[in-house]
């Protein structure tokens, strides 16, 4: 959403708000369309949406490694899966993630974006998304930053990997 719909100043525009949500598939197709346009290839959104995600990912091979060589659950997974797991169904998250990684690749003179480039920018990306969340919900939850930082796993939980397991059980 471009504006917070529950903000105290939105009563003047709430009748004009256009509700739109993205799927990760649409966001991946959007990235592929941008890459294809950069290389002078005209693909329509309709054409791209019809393709499977692995098929879409092949278009990205000219700008980033196809396999992300991370650790744990991210060990040798398709790069597009790593990207989709981080973007919260928000196109601007994907733009930010890819822009940071591309700048890192340029700085290190890499021909394409690699696992190393993504790993180098994850902390900056995460801090930015945390700040986005704080800014987005501050008017509704004034203490949102303390709440979010309080959810951070402890050192012991990190070592045991318990801090990253969330269930719906009470």
Name the predicted role of every residue range.
Residues 1-72, 115:
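The catalytic "switch" region of P-loop NTPases
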Residues 74-80, 84-169:
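Winged-helix-like regulatory helical subdomains adjacent to P-loop NTPase cores
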């Amino acid at each position: 959403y471009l504006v917070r719909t529950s903000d105290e100043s939105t009563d003047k525009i709430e009748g004009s708000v256009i509700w739109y949500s993205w799927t990760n598939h649409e966001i991946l197709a959007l990235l592929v369309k941008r890459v294809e346009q950069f290389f002078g290839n005209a693909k329509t959104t309709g054409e791209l949406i019809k393709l499977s995600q692995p098929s879409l990912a092949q278009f990205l091979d000219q700008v980033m490694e196809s396999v992300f060589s991370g650790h744990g659950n991210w060990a040798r997974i398709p790069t597009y899966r790593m990207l989709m797991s981080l973007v919260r169904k928000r196109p601007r998250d994907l733009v930010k993630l890819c822009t940071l990684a591309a700048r890192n690749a340029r700085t290190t003179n890499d021909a394409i974006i690699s696992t190393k480039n993504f790993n180098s920018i994850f902390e900056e990306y995460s801090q930015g998304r945390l700040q986005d969340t704080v800014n987005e919900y501050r008017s509704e939850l004034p203490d949102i930053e303390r709440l979010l930082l309080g959810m951070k796993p402890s050192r012991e939980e990190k070592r045991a990997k318990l801090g990253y397991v969330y269930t719906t059980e009470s």
